[in-house]
A protein has these predicted regions:
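Glycine- and aromatic-enriched membrane alpha-helices
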Residues: 3-40, 44-488
């Protein structure tokens, strides 16, 4: 039976996310005759410009809520599972890079995010990202705490009238992004941060940095592409996930300082097969990360294809540069290059075609490789190159989105602010809009991360002792060891 969202016009919090989105639907899309184009508008808007932009104005006659679409909702659920798989993939990827005495601790930092953020997102994180009660361009409200009234009594109500995705499926999908983002930061801090400090950092960073960023970009905030907003576009998380985690990693690594034995006794990765396994799982999961962000099974082929194409270009570019410069392509380089290409295409996946996808993957990979080598030259201890891959790769991808975005994939009906920028200033104008969004993200995330770490450091401390660092954090933090010392 079709369901409708309860009226909330009289609510002291004002219109809900569903009502606000419905207003946009009835005001802007009513004149679009092609049903497939109308549908694409919902998906493109949700993925790139913010699911609940605050448009204002009187809504037209309310439409009866249609049942959720089985194929599209299945894509959402399958995409959620794929994105969740990325976090164990990241654990293997990071774990392979560390010394054997720290591999469990490194992997646990990613796995623990699945537990902590998985609960935190349901309790309050989703609400801070997507509820519109505060009517703020910076952060959501508290009306959706505990996912209250999200999905209706049976959990099958659509996200908005006529929208084929259920609200619960959307909340689940977005929660997977919230889980992996702080896990990405851990790569800069492994082998020296205490697990207690990591617990508190994950909690506060997710609430005070990730959820506001998600709101500002996707939840109707000022960085989005809806009418009256900045006009920046981010298809699946170039700013929200990759730049945010990369900048946080850079700041955190600088505040923590280097490992006690670094760089005098740098060790090679202890398990390269782990790195390759992790990269493969990340690549596979990225189909959900980018592809399912289209929210439509019939039109998801484009971001699926641009995603894997950019990954291939990134891997090839990294290997060719190594081959030319060092004489041999490495397995670690192949894995890292693929991830760099995936990071680069994330903000652009639904806005570009194949040629630009190859260019973005290749250029992001090259930029990340240069950044990794600069880091080594200046001896900065970002342990696993988190900023160099996610910060630099995300920045490169976000800026190149401005250069390569196709007007056909950024229509004015669905991305009014971004389309206006493209119309008045072309791709160069969109490039500078993207640059403004990137610079804001750098500043906001850097300042917020520094404050969070300063408070945690004053309260419980940040680092383990030099003796504990020498012993290894597997045993110190967890009382376990990955390998039998008699056979290792």
């Amino acid at each position: 039976m079709p369901r409708t969202f309860p009226s909330d016009e009289a609510s002291p919090r004002g219109p809900s996310a569903a009502t606000t989105f419905h207003r946009f639907r009835t005001q802007v899309l009513a004149g679009v005759q092609d049903p497939q184009l109308r549908r694409f508008g919902f998906f493109a808007l949700a993925a790139g410009a913010g699911l609940i932009p605050l448009m204002g104005g009187a809504a037209k006659a309310a439409l009866q809520a249609a049942p959720t679409d089985g194929a599209d909702n299945t894509l959402m659920l399958f995409g959620s599972a794929l994105v969740l798989l990325m976090t164990p993939g990241l654990a293997f990827f990071y774990g392979g890079f560390t010394r054997s005495k720290n591999v469990l601790n490194t992997m646990m930092m990613s796995f623990f995010s699945m537990g902590l953020i998985g609960v935190l997102w349901v309790v309050i994180g989703y609400s801070l990202a997507f509820d519109t009660g505060f009517k703020s361009p910076f952060i959501g409200g508290l009306g959706a705490m505990w996912l209250n009234n999200v999905g209706g009594p049976l959990g099958d109500a659509p996200l908005a009238p006529g929208f084929p995705i259920s609200a619960t499926s959307f909340a689940l999908f977005q929660g997977m992004f919230a889980i992996i983002t702080p896990a990405l930061i851990s790569g800069a801090l492994v082998e020296r941060i205490s697990f207690k400090a990591w617990f508190w950092f994950c909690l506060f960073w997710s609430l005070l940095v990730y959820s506001p960023m998600a709101h500002m970009v996707w939840g109707g905030g000022f960085l989005g592409a809806a009418e009256g907003m900045m006009g920046a576009i981010d298809f699946a998380g170039g700013t929200v996930v990759h730049i945010a985690s990369g900048v946080a990693a850079l700041v955190a690594a600088a505040i923590l300082g280097p490992r006690t034995t670094w760089p005098n006794s740098k060790k090679p990765p202890h398990n390269v097969p782990f790195i390759l396994l992790g990269a493969g799982l990340l690549w596979f999961g990225w189909f959900g990360f980018n592809g399912a962000s289209m929210f439509a099974s019939k039109t998801a082929g484009l971001p699926f294809l641009t995603t894997t194409t950019a990954a291939s270009a990134g891997m090839l570019t990294w290997c060719l540069i190594e081959w030319f410069k060092d004489g041999k392509p490495t397995a670690v380089g192949a894995a890292t290059g693929a991830v760099a290409g995936l990071v680069g295409i994330t903000p652009a996946a639904g806005f570009v075609y194949m040629g630009p996808a190859i260019a973005i993957g290749a250029l992001a990979s090259a930029a990340c490789l240069i950044a990794v080598r600069i880091k080594a030259a200046i001896q900065f201890d970002d342990s696993l190159d988190t900023f160099m891959v996610h910060g630099v790769g995300g920045t490169t991808g976000a800026l190149l989105t401005g250069i390569f975005a196709s007007k056909a994939l950024v229509p004015a009906d669905y991305f009014p602010a971004a389309a206006k920028v493209l119309e008045s200033g072309g791709n160069l104008g969109l490039f500078f809009t993207q640059l403004k969004a990137v610079l804001f993200t750098y500043g906001f995330v850097a300042i917020a991360t520094a404050i969070i770490l300063w408070i945690i450091g004053a309260a419980v401390g940040l680092r383990v002792s030099p003796e504990e660092e020498e012993r290894g954090l597997d045993f110190v933090a967890h009382g376990e060891e990955a390998y039998d010392p008699m056979t290792n």
